[in-house]
């Protein structure tokens, strides 16, 4: 599933690193990869 993970506490973790977003996307959205969209401070999951 692709898309932004929403406002479920990803803003702070996004500032820290992309790895957290990547892990969250794989675990919660069953996506293949995830990265931080810095301008919006949100995780984006791809695949």
UniProtKB/Swiss-Prot annotation:
Keywords: Disulfide bond, Neurotoxin, Secreted, Toxin. This is Putative beta-neurotoxin. Expressed by the venom gland. InterPro entries: LCN-type_CS_alpha_beta_dom, Scorpion_toxin-like_sf, Scorpion_toxinL, Scorpion_toxinL/defensin. One of its GO terms (cellular component) is extracellular region. GO terms for molecular function: sodium channel inhibitor activity; toxin activity. The lineage of its organism: Eukaryota, Metazoa, Ecdysozoa, Arthropoda, Chelicerata. Residues 1-47 form the LCN-type CS-alpha/beta domain. The keyword Disulfide bond applies. Disulfide bonds join 14-36, 21-43. It is found in: Secreted. Belongs to the long (4 C-C) scorpion toxin superfamily. Sodium channel inhibitor family. Beta subfamily. Causes transient paralysis of the rear legs of and spasms in insects (A.domestica). Has the structural arrangement of an alpha-helix connected to antiparallel beta-sheets by disulfide bonds (CS-alpha/beta). The keyword Disulfide bond applies. It comes from Rhopalurus junceus (Caribbean blue scorpion).
